[in-house]
Amino acid sequence: MILAGEERARTITDKPVFIRGTGQALDGFQLTSLHEDYAHWPALKRAAESAYRMAGVGASDIDVAEVHDCFSIAELIAYEELGFCKKGEAGAFVAAGRSDYGGDVVVNPRGGLIGCGHPLGATGVAQAAEIFAQLRDEAGPRQVPGAAVALSHNNSGMGEHVVMIYGRDA
């Protein structure tokens, strides 16, 4: 993976992948507070909205996503905050197969953090590498057919979230 401007990228490869949008937001959490709502991550929602706006896409345009699933509930919360489904519907979204091949969006085709490991400091790079492979049609048996727009979500602790939108087109 090489980061380069659009013009240079087109001279390096005939299958460039472009970063089309980014968003970052931070919320403070008091883990000792009984008043915090840990099932909603407003910073993730703000980061996603910013990335979608910059990329000129919405949640329904995403073909494949790598989300930060450091524990099972984190993935479900991410589905809702990223706009893949409505609040309170993540369980039904997964049960209906909407986050799998043939569904609305294929999430974590390489197994996510739970399936592949969570190397602190390198997780985001691993996610980007999977997105890169997907958008270049180089993901082998994990390949999402026709993937053209992708998303990665990473977070630090519970309060800082980064969302990136990638595409085959600039």
Name each region found by the language model.
Residues M1-E7, P119-A139:
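Active-site-proximal alpha-helical scaffold in enzymes
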Residues M1-R46, S50, R98-R110, I114-C116, ...:
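Condensing-enzyme catalytic core mediating Claisen C-C bond formation in acyl metabolism
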Residues L31-E36, D69-A92, P119, M158-I165:
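Short glycine/threonine-rich loop-to-helix capping motif typified by GTGT followed
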Residues H40, L44, F71, G121-Q127, ...:
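Catalytic-loop motifs flanking and including active-site residues across diverse enzymes
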Residues H40-A55, E130-R136:
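Short, well-ordered amphipathic alpha-helical segments that serve as non-catalytic structural scaffolds
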Residues G58-D63, K87:
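Short acidic capping loops at alpha-helix termini that bridge into adjacent secondary structure
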Residues C85-G97, A139-P145:
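A glycine-biased, small/acidic residue-tolerant capping/turn segment at secondary-structure junctions
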